[in-house]
Amino acid sequence: KEYRRQRQMCIRDRIDVLNDRDVQTIIISPAKMEELKKSDMADRLLVHNIKLMTAPPLSEWNGQALSRTQLKEIQIEDLLQRNPIEIDIHKVASHLEGKRVMITGAAGSIGSEIMRQVASFNPYKLILVDQAETPLHDIRLELQDRWRDIDAETIIADISNATRMEDIFREFKPQYIFHAAAYKHVPMMEDNVSESIQVNVFGTRTVADLAVKYGAEKFVMISTDKAVNPTNVMGCSKRICEIYVQSLAKKLQKEGGHTTQFITTRFGNVLGSNGSVIPRFRDQIQRGGPVTVTHPEIIRYFMTIPEAVSYTHLRAHETLSDL
C-alpha cells in the first residue's frame, strides 16, 4: 500500500511539473510502451490534454535525425492491457492468391482492414464496393501507395440496388466475397428502421443471391453479437441476414450442383472500428469527463481490428472437420 501511495504521488508530481512547464506532447520510446500500459500515467496525461507519441527505435532514424513523419500518436487502443492475439493467417494465403476478391463496405474500418490483409496475399483482382465516396477515395490512394501492382476496382454502389450490383457481378465475377457493408449504429437504426431493413437485409439478400448466380466460391458475412437474441432494430436486421444466409446455404446443399459456401462471423466490440465506444470515451476524456458507461458494473471486452479480420480469414478457410 505504501509503495502504491508513493507511486501515485510520483505520477501526480510529474504531471504538476508538466503542467507548470506547459508541456503539450510527450514522446516515448517503444521500449517504454509496456511500462506505460501497466501504469495509469497515460490516463492521467490524456485527462490533462497532453498528447502521447511514440518514436521508432534508434536504428530506424535517418542518420541521427528523427523525422516528424516517424512519430505516431498513441491512441487509447494502443494501451490495451494484453498482448495482441497472434493468428497465423499465412496458411490461408493460398486460398486467396490469384483470386478475384470482392469486399463490400470496403471503405469502413473492418472492410478496409480486410482489403489490407487480402492485398498482402497477392489476389488477382480486388473489387472494392462502398457508397461512401470520400473514404473509398482514401482507400484507392492507399492502394496506389502500398500495392501498386494489384489490379483493383473501387466502385461506388449501394448494395441494395440489385440492378447496379448485378452489373458489377456480371463484369467482374468475384470468386470470394467479404460482405462487410451494413448500417450498425444501434440508436440511429432505431430511428431509421426502413433504411436498416433496406440495406442490411435486402442488401445482404441481393449480394448473397448474386454470389450464387455468378458461381462465387465463398461468401463471408460479417455479423455482430447483437444478433444474438436481438433487442434492437440493428441486431434484428443482422439476425435476419444470418437466417437468410443459413437458409440459402441449406437450400443449395439440398439441391446440389452449387459450389458457393457461406460463412458468418460475429464481432463484439472492435477497438478503433467505426461506431466503437472508444472514440466516444476519448472525446469524453479530452473534454475533461465524465466517461459514461451503460451500467456501473459493466465490463467490456475488446478485440483489435486486425485480430477481428484475421479471425475472419481463419474461420473462412477452415473445413467443416476443423470447426
Show the residue positions of the predicted features.
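Single conserved hydrophobic/aromatic residue that forms the stacking wall/gate
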Residues: 1-7, 11, 313-323
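Hydrophobic Val/Ile/Leu positions in short beta-strands of Rossmann-like dinucleotide-binding domains
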Residues: 11, 28, 103-104
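NAD(P)-cofactor binding segment of oxidoreductase domains
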Residues: 37-53, 125-132, 170-171, 176, ...
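Flexible, Lys/Arg-rich cytosolic regulatory linkers and terminal tails that connect or flank
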Residues: 38-100, 212
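Conserved Rossmann-fold NAD(P)-dependent oxidoreductase catalytic core, especially the SDR/UDP-sugar
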Residues: 64, 179, 183-243, 247
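N-terminal Rossmann/SDR dinucleotide-binding element
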Residues: 70, 81-173
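NAD(P)-dependent short-chain dehydrogenase/reductase
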Residues: 209-212, 233-315
